[in-house]
Amino acid sequence: MREIVYLQTGQCGNQIGAAFWQTISGEHGLDGSGVYNGSSDLQLERMNVYFNEASGNKYVPRAVLVDLEPGTMDAVRAGPFGQLFRPDNFVFGQSGAGNNWAKGHYTEGAELVDQVVDVVRREAEGCDCLQGFQITHSLGGGTGAGMGTLLISKIREEFPDRMMATFSVMPSPKVSDTVVEPYNATLSVHQLVEHSDETFCIDNEALYDICMRTLKLSNPSYGDLNHLVSAVMSGVTTCLRFPGQLNSDLRKLAVNMVPFPRLHFFMVGFAPLTSRGAHSFRAVSVPELTQQMFDPKNMMAASDFRNGRYLTCSAIFRGKVSMKEVEDQMRNIQSKNQTYFVEWIPNNIQTALCSIPPRGLKMSSTFIGNSTSIQELFKRVGDQFTAMFRRKAFLHWYTGEGMDEMEFTEAESNMNDLVSEYQQYQDASISEGEEEYLEEEEPLEHEE
């Protein structure tokens, strides 16, 4: 069986993680203490992708919860699913990282990281066939960003051939939680480019927009946002956990989605999203799912794919869906929106089907897109970074923890490189390549 070890770091990561385990437990028929009381054998069949079986029909998440301060952990423990987790898997410090990436990556976090890696190692040893790691964290803070990326590189060293998928909450364009967000995010992206296999970019502002525009919530809470994220996270791994006609897993996803190793930052979406009162007024069908799934308003990252082009994308359908209908819809989308897909990757939509829908829905779909427009997100953070770094504002907090200014410069140029790589592939077309071939072939004619 293909197991996944799940890490949640920092406040944001732990809160999303808590919502995710709530979703997953519901899908597999587990109650708040991990006891199975579901109705279908299918729920049990691949329970061990995310859960270890303990004695007495109790299932324990293969999750490692990490934070540099005990607050969030206590909140998770006191939450509705707090009794689910194994107590040894809570690893926390006392000092906190104080939104300082250097503290999370070099000082406070580095002291705690070996403890975390021990727990990860123990979880990995209990697996038959480890598929990879999933990490939830934010890139704007200290622990999730600094220590999260440190963990990723440590795990990379130890398990070089396993998939590393991260769900990273990017800083929002308008809403900022901390002033030093651009620093933390740029330093984190610098790490993710090198060490992660697939990074799903999520952004609070886009989530707020979805909650307000589509779900018609007047003042959405973080709980509502995390619920949206957990729907996508559950969708990405649904093929591992339930049978389907066309399977996908983290590795297949990466192979189909990442045309060039550095360009592994994805936009995600989920359908159907309807406001609570409007459920009874619409029937969900494949065309409707497809339409909503490819709607820019539905993307959970604040960049508009109409400003770029899709290199690749993946659609994961759940429920009783006809294969043919899905393929027709996908072909339809590609032919209607040709300008939004690069023409040098002919069939760039990967589809997967899973026969079991999420709770309370007849069918649903998860969308993952690798679009060049994600560069907007990095550009925005990069501009804010440059503005502050030019004046060396707040830098003493980082150098005081032993960081060097060089590291900032490197991170900045790495992010700028990433942006220009995306731009280069956005502008690339088939014809450029053909002209070169023609030039090479021409001399042959004269030789005859």
Swiss-Prot record:
GO terms for biological process: microtubule-based process. Mg(2+) binds at residue 69. Its cofactor is Mg(2+). Keywords: Cytoplasm, Cytoskeleton, GTP-binding, Magnesium, Metal-binding, Microtubule, Nucleotide-binding. Residues 432-448 have a biased composition (Acidic residues). Its main location: cytoplasm. GO terms for molecular function: GTP binding; GTPase activity; metal ion binding; structural constituent of cytoskeleton. The keyword Aminoacyl-tRNA synthetase does not apply. GTP binds at residues 11, 69, 138, 142-144, 204, 226. Residues 425-448 are annotated as: Disordered. This is Tubulin beta chain. The lineage of its organism: Eukaryota, Fungi, Dikarya, Ascomycota, Pezizomycotina.
